[in-house]
From Swiss-Prot:
<dbReference type="InterPro" id="IPR036574">
    <property type="entry name" value="Scorpion_toxin-like_sf"/>
</dbReference>
<feature type="domain" description="LCN-type CS-alpha/beta">
    <location>
        <begin position="21"/>
        <end position="82"/>
    </location>
</feature>
<dbReference type="InterPro" id="IPR002061">
    <property type="entry name" value="Scorpion_toxinL/defensin"/>
</dbReference>
<keyword id="KW-0800">Toxin</keyword>
<comment type="similarity">
    <text>Belongs to the long (4 C-C) scorpion toxin superfamily. Sodium channel inhibitor family. Alpha subfamily.</text>
</comment>
<keyword id="KW-1015">Disulfide bond</keyword>
<feature type="disulfide bond">
    <location>
        <begin position="39"/>
        <end position="63"/>
    </location>
</feature>
<feature type="signal peptide">
    <location>
        <begin position="1"/>
        <end position="19"/>
    </location>
</feature>
<dbReference type="GO" id="GO:0090729">
    <property type="term" value="F:toxin activity"/>
</dbReference>
<feature type="propeptide" description="Removed by a carboxypeptidase">
    <location>
        <position position="84"/>
    </location>
</feature>
<feature type="disulfide bond">
    <location>
        <begin position="43"/>
        <end position="65"/>
    </location>
</feature>
<keyword id="KW-0528">Neurotoxin</keyword>
<keyword id="KW-0738">Voltage-gated sodium channel impairing toxin</keyword>
<dbReference type="GO" id="GO:0006952">
    <property type="term" value="P:defense response"/>
</dbReference>
<keyword id="KW-0732">Signal</keyword>
<keyword id="KW-0964">Secreted</keyword>
<dbReference type="InterPro" id="IPR044062">
    <property type="entry name" value="LCN-type_CS_alpha_beta_dom"/>
</dbReference>
Length: 84
């Protein structure tokens, strides 16, 4: 009986759960992607369920992704965009 519990626990830990979140998708410099090309394609290409154009102060129009995987960076308001 104990073996069954241990095996079940091990399988549960090995499968892992991939979590998702919503947010403004960014590049490696914490700069948002603007709405051209259309956001839905960009977001889906990066594993999100969907994407749309939203307004982010002070960046302006930016791509908002729904259900984006954790390994894809989203806008961190505590860091500025470091372009160029």
């Amino acid at each position: 009986m104990n073996y069954l519990v241990m095996i079940s626990l091990a399988l549960l830990l090995m499968t892992g759960v991939e979590s998702v979140r919503d947010g403004y998708i960014v590049d490696s410099k914490n700069c948002v992607y603007h709405c051209v090309p259309p956001c839905d394609g960009l977001c889906k290409k990066n594993g999100a369920k969907s994407g749309s154009c939203g307004f982010l102060i002070p960046s302006g129009l930016a791509c908002w992704c729904v259900a984006l995987p954790d390994n894809v960076p989203i806008k961190d308001p505590s860091y500025k965009c470091h372009s160029r």
